[in-house]
Amino acid sequence: MTPKLILASSSPFRRMLMENAGLFFEAHPAEIDERAVEAPLEKAGAKPDTVACVLAKAKAEDVSARFPESLVIGSDQTMSLGDRVFHKPKDIADAANHLRALSGTTHRLNSAIVLVRDGAVLWEHVGHAELTMRPLTEDFIARHLSRVGERALSSVGAYQLEGEGVQLFEKIEGDYFTILGLPMLPLLGKLRELGTIDG
C-alpha cells in the first residue's frame, strides 16, 4: 500500500517533530545532490529563502517520483549572516570558524516546506527566524565544541538550539519549529486544509 504522507528527509529532528505532532507518515530521504542544485542558484545571487525553497521542492519532487500518489513533504533550511550563506560545517575546525563568524551577531534561518503530489507542487512556505548569538571567546568555543563534538556538524551554524547550543544565544525572534527546520504550525494548517489530517 502506498503511504498517504511521506517526509522527504533523513533528519531525525524533522521526524521527531512530526511524530510528536501525532502524524502518521513514512520517511524516505531524497536522492539528490543538494550542492549541485544549490550552486547555480548561489552563483546567480538567489536569496537564501529562495535557495531553501528550491531545495525543498527538489527533495519533494524526487521522492514524489517514487511515490506518486502520496503527499510528500520536502523541507530545507538555509542560514545567512548578511550576504554570507552558511552550510553544515565540514569538520570541527570549520564549526569553530562558523561560531567565530556568528559570535556577537544576528543571523537568519530560512526554513522552507513544499508539498508535492504526483510531481505537482501544491503548496510552498518559508518561515524565518532571527537569532542573536552572544559574544563568544576562543576558549568558550573550544570548550563548547569539545562537549558537543560531531553533533556540531549536523546543522548549519554548528549549533543545535534544542541542546547545549541554546547557551550560545542572547536573543531569538521567530517560531521554535522554524528554527528546528520544519515550520509545523503552517504545515499542520495546510494538512488540515487538504484533508490529510483531522481538522
UniProtKB/Swiss-Prot annotation:
The record marks F13, Q77, E162 as: Important for substrate specificity. The lineage of its organism: Bacteria, Pseudomonadati, Pseudomonadota, Alphaproteobacteria, Hyphomicrobiales. This is 7-methyl-GTP pyrophosphatase. It comes from Rhizobium etli (strain ATCC 51251 / DSM 11541 / JCM 21823 / NBRC 15573 / CFN 42). Pfam families: Maf (PF02545). One of its GO terms (molecular function) is nucleoside triphosphate diphosphatase activity. It is found in: Cytoplasm. CDD domains: Maf. It is an enzyme of class 3 (hydrolase). The active site is at D76 (proton acceptor). PANTHER family: BIFUNCTIONAL DTTP/UTP PYROPHOSPHATASE/METHYLTRANSFERASE PROTEIN-RELATED, BIFUNCTIONAL DTTP_UTP PYROPHOSPHATASE_METHYLTRANSFERASE PROTEIN-RELATED. Nucleoside triphosphate pyrophosphatase that hydrolyzes 7-methyl-GTP (m(7)GTP). May have a dual role in cell division arrest and in preventing the incorporation of modified nucleotides into cellular nucleic acids. The keyword Hydrolase applies. It comes from the Bacteria.
